Swiss-Prot record:
Region of interest: Disordered: 43-79
InterPro entries: TatA/B/E (IPR003369), TatA/E (IPR006312)
Protein source organism: Shewanella sp. (strain W3-18-1)
Lineage, highest ranks first: Bacteria, Pseudomonadati, Pseudomonadota, Gammaproteobacteria, Alteromonadales
Subcellular localization, as worded in the UniProt entry: Cell inner membrane
GO cellular component: TAT protein transport complex
Keyword terms, alphabetized: Cell inner membrane, Cell membrane, Membrane, Protein transport, Translocation, Transmembrane, Transmembrane helix, Transport
Function of the protein: Part of the twin-arginine translocation (Tat) system that transports large folded proteins containing a characteristic twin-arginine motif in their signal peptide across membranes. TatA could form the protein-conducting channel of the Tat system.
Membrane topology: Single-pass membrane protein
Subunit structure: The Tat system comprises two distinct complexes: a TatABC complex, containing multiple copies of TatA, TatB and TatC subunits, and a separate TatA complex, containing only TatA subunits. Substrates initially bind to the TatABC complex, which probably triggers association of the separate TatA complex to form the active translocon.
Molecular function per GO: protein transmembrane transporter activity
UniProt record similarity statement: Belongs to the TatA/E family.
Protein name: Sec-independent protein translocase protein TatA
Amino acid sequence: MGGISIWQLLIIALIVVLLFGTKKLRSLGGDLGGAVKGFKNAMSSEEDKKALEDTEAAKTAQTTQQATEKKPESNKEQA
């Protein structure tokens, strides 16, 4: 009671195909697929960009830390 059965879904699908036609539905599906693919590419490129920034920041921090550790040693040598 209140649920949609498989037969009701099939009837709705048949009506949609009759109203819009298969070519229109195919192009609509292609457009939707392209939009989803573009969204996924944008999300993955954003994640890649963030990961690249994180690794660059870590390298910079490590280089800075190594440079500050070497400075006291060179001061001792001069004294």
